Design a protein with these regions (language model features):
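Short, charged low-complexity intrinsically disordered segments located at boundaries
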Residues: 57, 105-108, 126-129, 148-150, ...
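Short, surface-exposed recognition loops or helix-turn segments adjacent to catalytic cores
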Residues: 110-114, 144-153, 172-176
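Short secondary-structure boundary/hinge segments and terminal tails
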Residues: 21, 70, 118, 152-153
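An acidic intrinsically disordered interaction segment
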Residues: 117-125
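Acidic two-metal-ion nuclease catalytic site recognized across multiple nuclease folds
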Residues: 160-240
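Conserved non-catalytic scaffold segment of RNase H-like nuclease domains
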Residues: 1-112, 124-146
């Protein structure tokens, strides 16, 4: 067990303002970079869908979709024992915390997590902090981009490229090993698994290109890290 790469599509950017997760994608990646499994589902957010032009999900798509509470047990089991990985992980972690709290569960502090966006500065990605730009730097195909399932799979392939590229770099094998070891000892809330059927997004549907994808063709790559990278990623979610 090693990594659970996650992507959320949401009704907005601030869980404190009652924005909710409307789609989950999870891809498992092993220590050696092998991709072991993929899961995804639309979710009924129990509110309006927010900016549908961003996530591309229609009201008809979620009529018989489960709620987060319906699948929280199965989702937590997919995360258990694995490092939580996402592109702009701080964004997804905030929503994970908020959604878990709505079920009456609380995450223990110090959830082991990695951010493929932040890590990119170590692998020649530079300021291309969007997922599509980072994947482009490694020739990773993003078929049907902007669905949670495909974005999680794309980020998983990006993580695999990082793992392979750093296998012989001084200090990096220990870095990955320590993250994986921490995850093995971390406990997610143990929630009842309800056995509710997951509902993937209909095949062939995706959201439009993001603002940065439409406007960054041929843009130079400057080094952007930390808070700057997170700000740009947040801006990208707003400017569609």
């Amino acid at each position: 067990m090693a990594y659970a790469v996650v992507d959320f599509e949401t009704t907005g950017i601030l869980p404190a303002y009652h924005h909710r997760v409307v789609e989950i994608g999870v891809t498992h990646v092993e220590d050696d970079g092998t991709i072991r499994g993929r899961w995804e589902t639309l979710l009924n957010p129990e509110r309006d869908l927010g900016p549908q032009h961003i996530h591309g999900i229609r009201a008809a798509d979620i009529l018989d979709a489960p709620t987060f509470a319906d699948i929280a047990g199965e989702f937590a089991a997919l995360l258990q024992g694995r490092v939580f990985v996402a592109h702009n992980a701080s964004f997804d972690m905030r929503f994970l915390q908020a959604e878990m709290e709505r079920t009456g569960a609380w995450l223990n502090g110090g959830t082991p997590s990695l951010c493929t966006m932040t890590l990119g500065s170590n692998f020649g990605v530079g300021g291309a902090c969007s997922l599509v730009s980072a994947c482009g730097a490694f020739s990773i195909d993003r078929h049907l981009a902007h669905s949670a399932g495909y974005d999680a799979f794309a980020a998983a392939q990006l993580l695999r490229a990082y793992l392979g590229g750093s296998a012989t770099w001084p200090g990096w094998p220990d870095y990955w090993r320590q993250a994986s070891d921490a995850a093995r000892h971390y406990r997610y809330p143990e929630l009842a698994q309800r056995g509710v059927t997951w509902k993937p997004r209909p095949q062939g549907t995706s959201a439009p290109q993001s603002f940065l994808e439409r406007s960054s063709t041929g843009a130079s790559r400057e080094t952007v890290t930390g808070a700057e990278a997170q700000y740009i990623a947040l801006l990208d979610r707003c400017l569609l």
